[in-house]
Design a protein with these regions (language model features):
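Membrane-embedded helical hairpins/re-entrant loop segments and their flanking transmembrane helices
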Residues: 106-137, 149-163
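Transmembrane helical segments that form the transport core of multi-pass membrane transport proteins
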Residues: 255-372
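Membrane-interfacial helix-loop connectors
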Residues: 150-161, 188-198, 345-404, 418-420
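Core transmembrane alpha-helical segments of multi-pass membrane transporters/permeases
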Residues: 75-107, 128, 132-133, 300-334
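Hydrophobic mid-bilayer segments of alpha-helices in multi-pass membrane transport proteins
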Residues: 12-17, 31-71, 90-97, 248-254, ...
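Long, contiguous bundles of hydrophobic transmembrane helices that form the permeation core
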Residues: 4, 210-298
Length: 452
């Protein structure tokens, strides 16, 4: 079969999964559960030959182990198909959410950002924190695409002494976006599994995102003191003024307000609201700005380049969802609380430590955080471990975010390693201390502000 035909089949299958999922959410027609699950099984079989290495073995392990567990539990056909469809929300998000990033890349905004960066971020701390904050803001809308965009801004003028520190800032900024972006797989997975609206966890996650900035600066403050920056540019020497692009600021703020307003007014799942907003809001913005050519190019690039590049993640996430469903059929959700009761600490505290250690520990050895998060969110009843659903959501999202910068399998670490011409471990290692401090900060934050 010709590669072009195969690629078209894969795209059609992925779009079909999203379409059936949306139809199921709108109609609640139960037969669609079987169609959706069947499409997922077909997609995994079709995409499996494209996988290599750890991703291939993990996907196969999840499918085989999940099938064995369901067979041992004598689960009926409905459970099999429901389990297969657990993570289709993420596939749907992959299809639509990246469209929000098209207006962010408008040439006028990128040029204005370059000047803003060059003129305003002159001190070492300002450059470090500004890079992290900008990556976080851009990451909310363009996901991993924020890394090359901000990288080009940061490294327009080489800063040899700060290369690795700025890479840390990029890495941790992306982790901050994981904490609160409604367009990320992490938020979709956790809020969907726990039945929470995004707005209910947003205040806590924004607080945690601010905490991550402080912890990041604290961890690297000693190194920042001993670095000499390059000479400022002529624009900076002349003290020219450069403000953050007004249009881009309005676009970013309005995108969040649109989602918050839709969540309150329209009684639909968050994923469907994001799909609706992603199809209309960026298109309308580019139309008003007279940048429809940029929109068409961005849309075409998303369908023909970005989506095919996500085949590995899509297959792994679907397999992880199936495995999570099989775990949910067992008594795993009851076993964990009963084991934790033997430890002489409050169950909520013990479970929090266990969760952070599990997600961070498995990420450290190369397992994607979605795997433990899917299992925990899908099989543990927060009330059984004496915590609230919101506490559980903050715990899972916080653990995922602090694990991302230390994972050798994360897309960000691999992308930065390529850009900096270093090994992925050289990029990840400086973040170990950050992850440890954030883990401690997360525990304190949960116990003081979120509570049980």
């Amino acid at each position: 079969m010709a590669p072009a035909v195969k690629a078209a089949m894969e795209r059609t299958l992925i779009f079909s999964i999203a379409a059936v999922y949306i139809a199921l959410q709108l109609t609640k027609f139960e037969l669609l559960i079987y169609l959706l699950g069947g499409l997922v099984f077909v997609a995994i079989v079709l995409l499996l030959p494209k996988l290599k290495g750890m991703t291939l073995w993990l996907t196969m392990s999840f499918m085989v182990t999940g099938a064995v567990l369901l067979w041992l539990q004598k689960a009926d056909a409905r459970i099999w198909f429901e389990s297969a469809g657990i993570n289709v929300t993420i596939v749907t998000l992959f299809l639509f959410a990246p469209l929000f990033g098209i207006p962010v890349r408008l040439p006028a905004y990128v040029e204005a950002l370059k000047k803003f960066y060059e003129v305003n971020l002159r001190s070492k701390s300002a450059l470090f924190l500004g890079t992290q904050l900008l990556t976080q803001l851009m990451g909310v809308f363009i996901n991993v695409g924020s890394i090359p965009v901000v990288y080009q801004l940061v490294y327009v003028k080489p800063q040899p002494g700060m290369n690795l520190l700025l890479a840390n800032a990029l890495n941790r900024g992306f982790a901050g976006a994981i904490l609160w972006s409604p367009y990320f797989a992490a938020m979709t997975l956790v809020t969907s599994a726990l039945g929470l609206p995004w707005s209910s966890v947003l205040p806590y996650m924004l607080g945690l995102a601010i905490l991550s900035l402080f912890v990041s600066w604290l961890v690297d403050s000693r190194e920042l003191l001993h670095i000499d920056l390059a000479e400022p540019s002529q624009a900076a020497k002349k003290k020219e003024r450069a403000v953050f692009p007004f249009g881009l600021g309005i676009y970013l703020i309005a995108a969040i307000i649109v989602i918050l307003a839709m969540e309150r007014v329209i009684d639909l799942p968050m994923v469907l609201l994001i799909c609706l907003a992603a199809l209309s809001y960026p298109l309308l913005w580019c139309f008003v700005k007279g940048e429809m050519t940029v929109y068409k190019e961005g849309f075409k690039n998303h369908v023909t380049v970005t989506l095919p590049a996500l085949r590995k993640e899509i297959t792994l996430f679907l397999a992880a969802g199936f495995f999570s469903g099989s775990i949910g059929v067992t008594k795993f959700g009851e076993i964990v609380p009963s084991l934790l009761e033997h430890i002489p600490l409050p169950v909520a505290v013990t479970f929090s430590i266990f969760t952070v250690a599990l997600i961070a520990g498995t990420s450290l050895i190369g397992l994607h955080p979605i795997v433990p998060v899917t299992i925990l969110a899908g099989s543990i009843d927060p009330l059984h471990v004496q915590i609230s659903p919101i506490y559980f959501a903050v715990l899972l999202l916080g653990s995922w975010a602090l694990s991302n910068p230390i994972s050798p399998a994360s897309a960000v670490n691999n992308l930065l390693a390529g850009l900096l011409k270093k090994t992925v471990f050289e990029v990840a290692m400086p973040n170990y201390k950050f992850a440890a401090c954030m883990a401690l900060g997360l525990m304190i934050y949960l116990l003081i502000l979120v509570k049980f």
